[in-house]
Amino acid sequence: MLSENVVKLLNDQMNLEFYSSNLYLQMSAWCDQQGFEGTAKFLSVHAAEEMQHMRKLFTYLNETGSLAVISAIEAPAHEYKSLKEVIETTYEHEKLITSKINELVGKTFEEKDYSAFNFLQWYVEEQHEEEKLFSSILDKLNFLGEDGKGLFLIDKDLGNLSTKA
Protein backbone atom coordinates (compact mmCIF):
# COMPACT_ATOMS: atom_id res chain seq x y z
CA MET A 1 0.00 0.00 0.00
CA LEU A 2 1.37 3.36 -1.01
CA SER A 3 1.50 6.21 1.48
CA GLU A 4 -0.53 9.36 0.81
CA ASN A 5 2.70 11.27 0.14
CA VAL A 6 3.89 8.77 -2.46
CA VAL A 7 0.45 8.64 -4.12
CA LYS A 8 0.43 12.43 -4.39
CA LEU A 9 3.94 12.49 -5.87
CA LEU A 10 3.11 9.68 -8.32
CA ASN A 11 -0.03 11.52 -9.42
CA ASP A 12 1.98 14.74 -9.80
CA GLN A 13 4.53 12.88 -11.91
CA MET A 14 1.81 11.25 -13.99
CA ASN A 15 0.34 14.66 -14.76
CA LEU A 16 3.78 16.08 -15.53
CA GLU A 17 4.31 13.28 -18.05
CA PHE A 18 0.92 14.16 -19.56
CA TYR A 19 2.03 17.80 -19.82
CA SER A 20 5.30 16.64 -21.42
CA SER A 21 3.34 14.83 -24.11
CA ASN A 22 1.27 17.94 -24.81
CA LEU A 23 4.39 20.12 -24.83
CA TYR A 24 6.20 17.98 -27.39
CA LEU A 25 3.08 17.63 -29.53
CA GLN A 26 2.63 21.42 -29.52
CA MET A 27 6.29 21.88 -30.39
CA SER A 28 5.87 19.45 -33.27
CA ALA A 29 3.03 21.62 -34.63
CA TRP A 30 5.27 24.72 -34.49
CA CYS A 31 8.09 22.84 -36.22
CA ASP A 32 5.74 21.61 -38.92
CA GLN A 33 4.55 25.19 -39.56
CA GLN A 34 8.16 26.33 -39.86
CA GLY A 35 9.06 23.62 -42.37
CA PHE A 36 11.05 21.48 -39.93
CA GLU A 37 9.27 18.30 -40.93
CA GLY A 38 11.90 15.94 -39.51
CA THR A 39 11.87 17.66 -36.14
CA ALA A 40 8.06 17.74 -36.16
CA LYS A 41 7.99 13.98 -36.72
CA PHE A 42 10.64 13.41 -34.03
CA LEU A 43 8.73 15.49 -31.46
CA SER A 44 5.43 13.82 -32.36
CA VAL A 45 6.98 10.40 -31.73
CA HIS A 46 8.47 11.73 -28.51
CA ALA A 47 5.04 13.04 -27.44
CA ALA A 48 3.65 9.51 -27.85
CA GLU A 49 6.50 8.14 -25.70
CA GLU A 50 5.69 10.65 -22.95
CA MET A 51 2.07 9.52 -23.04
CA GLN A 52 3.30 5.94 -22.53
CA HIS A 53 5.24 7.16 -19.48
CA MET A 54 2.04 8.72 -18.17
CA ARG A 55 0.03 5.53 -18.80
CA LYS A 56 2.65 3.45 -17.01
CA LEU A 57 2.24 5.59 -13.87
CA PHE A 58 -1.55 5.53 -14.26
CA THR A 59 -1.55 1.74 -14.38
CA TYR A 60 0.88 1.42 -11.45
CA LEU A 61 -1.25 3.67 -9.25
CA ASN A 62 -4.38 1.67 -10.03
CA GLU A 63 -2.63 -1.69 -9.58
CA THR A 64 -1.50 -0.67 -6.10
CA GLY A 65 -5.05 0.12 -5.00
CA SER A 66 -4.51 3.86 -5.27
CA LEU A 67 -6.49 6.24 -7.43
CA ALA A 68 -4.81 7.75 -10.48
CA VAL A 69 -6.06 11.34 -10.64
CA ILE A 70 -5.73 13.26 -13.89
CA SER A 71 -5.59 16.98 -13.17
CA ALA A 72 -6.14 19.96 -15.42
CA ILE A 73 -3.11 20.26 -17.67
CA GLU A 74 -1.72 23.71 -18.45
CA ALA A 75 -1.53 24.53 -22.14
CA PRO A 76 2.09 24.57 -23.34
CA ALA A 77 3.65 27.48 -25.19
CA HIS A 78 2.90 27.42 -28.89
CA GLU A 79 5.25 30.08 -30.23
CA TYR A 80 9.02 29.87 -30.42
CA LYS A 81 11.68 32.16 -31.86
CA SER A 82 13.80 29.42 -33.38
CA LEU A 83 14.46 25.72 -33.64
CA LYS A 84 17.27 26.22 -31.13
CA GLU A 85 14.77 27.60 -28.61
CA VAL A 86 12.61 24.50 -29.11
CA ILE A 87 15.56 22.18 -28.48
CA GLU A 88 16.79 24.20 -25.49
CA THR A 89 13.28 24.10 -24.03
CA THR A 90 13.07 20.32 -24.45
CA TYR A 91 16.44 19.86 -22.76
CA GLU A 92 15.49 22.10 -19.82
CA HIS A 93 12.16 20.31 -19.52
CA GLU A 94 13.86 16.90 -19.41
CA LYS A 95 16.15 18.16 -16.64
CA LEU A 96 13.04 19.22 -14.71
CA ILE A 97 11.51 15.76 -15.19
CA THR A 98 14.74 14.18 -13.94
CA SER A 99 14.71 16.31 -10.79
CA LYS A 100 11.08 15.34 -10.10
CA ILE A 101 11.83 11.64 -10.64
CA ASN A 102 14.81 11.89 -8.30
CA GLU A 103 12.64 13.57 -5.68
CA LEU A 104 10.07 10.80 -6.01
CA VAL A 105 12.70 8.05 -5.83
CA GLY A 106 14.17 9.69 -2.73
CA LYS A 107 10.77 9.82 -1.06
CA THR A 108 10.04 6.13 -1.76
CA PHE A 109 13.43 5.17 -0.34
CA GLU A 110 12.91 7.38 2.71
CA GLU A 111 9.54 5.70 3.33
CA LYS A 112 11.04 2.25 2.71
CA ASP A 113 8.56 1.63 -0.11
CA TYR A 114 10.89 -0.64 -2.04
CA SER A 115 8.24 -1.79 -4.50
CA ALA A 116 7.61 1.79 -5.67
CA PHE A 117 11.36 2.47 -5.50
CA ASN A 118 11.95 -0.51 -7.80
CA PHE A 119 9.16 0.56 -10.17
CA LEU A 120 10.72 4.01 -10.52
CA GLN A 121 14.14 2.68 -11.54
CA TRP A 122 12.85 2.41 -15.11
CA TYR A 123 12.17 6.16 -15.04
CA VAL A 124 15.63 6.88 -13.64
CA GLU A 125 17.23 5.07 -16.58
CA GLU A 126 14.81 6.63 -19.05
CA GLN A 127 15.65 10.13 -17.84
CA HIS A 128 19.35 9.46 -18.20
CA GLU A 129 18.70 8.55 -21.84
CA GLU A 130 16.42 11.55 -22.42
CA GLU A 131 18.90 14.08 -21.05
CA LYS A 132 21.71 12.49 -23.03
CA LEU A 133 19.63 12.60 -26.22
CA PHE A 134 18.54 16.22 -25.95
CA SER A 135 21.97 17.35 -24.81
CA SER A 136 23.54 15.73 -27.88
CA ILE A 137 20.96 17.34 -30.19
CA LEU A 138 21.71 20.73 -28.66
CA ASP A 139 25.46 20.11 -29.01
CA LYS A 140 25.00 19.28 -32.71
CA LEU A 141 22.88 22.36 -33.25
CA ASN A 142 25.49 24.55 -31.56
CA PHE A 143 28.23 22.95 -33.64
CA LEU A 144 26.41 23.20 -36.97
CA GLY A 145 24.98 26.65 -36.34
CA GLU A 146 21.62 28.13 -37.19
CA ASP A 147 22.25 28.94 -40.82
CA GLY A 148 20.20 27.17 -43.48
CA LYS A 149 22.58 24.23 -43.92
CA GLY A 150 22.94 23.58 -40.19
CA LEU A 151 19.19 23.66 -39.62
CA PHE A 152 18.62 21.42 -42.63
CA LEU A 153 21.08 18.83 -41.30
CA ILE A 154 19.64 18.87 -37.77
CA ASP A 155 16.10 18.57 -39.10
CA LYS A 156 17.07 15.67 -41.33
CA ASP A 157 18.93 13.96 -38.46
CA LEU A 158 15.93 14.29 -36.13
CA GLY A 159 13.64 12.94 -38.82
CA ASN A 160 15.90 9.90 -39.10
CA LEU A 161 15.92 9.48 -35.30
CA SER A 162 12.12 9.37 -35.26
CA THR A 163 12.09 6.35 -37.56
CA LYS A 164 14.45 4.48 -35.20
CA ALA A 165 12.26 5.07 -32.13
Curated annotation (Swiss-Prot):
As for subcellular location, the record says: Cytoplasm
Q: Which domain of life is it from?
A: Bacteria
Spell out the protein name for this chain: Probable bacterial non-heme ferritin-like protein
Q: Where does Fe cation 1 bind?
A: E17, E50, H53
Under the heading InterPro entries, the entry gives: Ferritin (IPR001519), Ferritin-like (IPR012347), Ferritin-like_diiron (IPR009040), Ferritin-like_SF (IPR009078), Ferritin_DPS_dom (IPR008331), Ferritin_prok (IPR041719)
What lineage is on file? Bacteria, Pseudomonadati, Pseudomonadota, Gammaproteobacteria, Pasteurellales
Source organism: Haemophilus influenzae (strain ATCC 51907 / DSM 11121 / KW20 / Rd)
**UniProt binding sites for Fe cation 2:** E50, E94, Q127
GO BP field = intracellular iron ion homeostasis; iron ion transport
- Every copy of the Ferritin-like diiron domain together lies at 1-145
* Family, per entry: Belongs to the ferritin family. Prokaryotic subfamily.
PROSITE patterns, sorted: FERRITIN_LIKE (PS50905)
Which keywords are on file for this protein?
Cytoplasm, Iron, Iron storage, Metal-binding, Oxidoreductase
The protein's matches in Gene3D superfamilies, at most eight in alphabetical order, are given as: 1.20.1260.10
Positions of disulphide bridges: none
* A GO molecular-function descriptor: ferroxidase activity
Cellular component (GO) terms are: cytoplasm; cytosol
Primary location group:
cytoplasm
Which Pfam family, any one of them, does this sequence belong to? Answer: Ferritin
